[in-house]
Amino acid sequence: MANTVSAKKMTRKIAKRTAINRSRRSRMRTFVRKVEEAIATGDQGQALAALRVAEPEIMRAAQHGIVHKNNASRKVSRLAARVKAIAA
C-alpha cells in the first residue's frame, strides 16, 4: 500500500494510464478482428475496406506505445498479404 502522497498519486496515474492503454489495445484488436472476419468470408472488397480502416488504428497504437512500431508494421503487412491472397 502506498504511504506517501507522491506514491498515492503515482498509483492513481498508473491506474488511469492502464485503463487508457487497455482501451486502445482493445480498439486495435477489434479492427484487426474485423479484417480477419472479412478475409474469412472471402470477400476481397470488404476485406480491403476493413484493412484501410484498421491500418491507421494499428499505427496509432504503435505511436502511443501500445505495440512496438515493428510489431504494428508486421501486423499490417501480414494482413495486407492475406487480403491480397484472396484474389489469387
UniProtKB/Swiss-Prot annotation:
It holds the Pfam family Ribosomal_S20p. One of its GO terms (biological process) is translation. GO terms for molecular function: small ribosomal subunit rRNA binding; structural constituent of ribosome. The keyword Ribonucleoprotein applies. The keyword Ribosomal protein applies. InterPro entries: Ribosomal_bS20 (IPR002583), Ribosomal_bS20_sf (IPR036510). GO terms for cellular component: cytosol; small ribosomal subunit. Keywords: Ribonucleoprotein, Ribosomal protein, RNA-binding, rRNA-binding. Belongs to the bacterial ribosomal protein bS20 family. HAMAP family: Ribosomal_bS20. Binds directly to 16S ribosomal RNA. This is Small ribosomal subunit protein bS20.
